[in-house]
Amino acid sequence: MLPDSYYREIDALAELYEASIGRLASAQVLDRAAFGRFRDAITSFLTQSKAHSVVPKRALLLVNTSANFCKSTAEFSEDREFIAEFGTFMTRAFFLLASGEDFDDRQPGVPRII
């Protein structure tokens, strides 16, 4: 069983999702600060998730939905580059979360030795 703090972290991610992605989807307002907080929280959550062998579906859904929304919205957004980059970040975060890794586990240009 996962600790309560882990579920509280997922609740916090959901709130940050609404403040960033949800606000962009419903009101067409791009709050870069909210996206930054969401990015930081996802990075922290990935590190915390490495200690557990399971990841709740809700967390996977939040990350995957964010990635898909950003990819589909970037083309029509005023700030295409920012939204597309965030979508790429979330896609990478999704696969790292599913594999039990975080951003520090893989370094570009360096062969991975298992």
Model feature map: region roles:
Residues 47-63, 80-83:
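Short, charged early-sequence alpha-helical segments and their helix-coil boundaries
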Residues 62-114:
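Amphipathic alpha-helical binding modules
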Residues 21-31, 52, 76, 80-83:
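Alpha-helical rod/repeat scaffolding segments in eukaryotic adaptors/tethers
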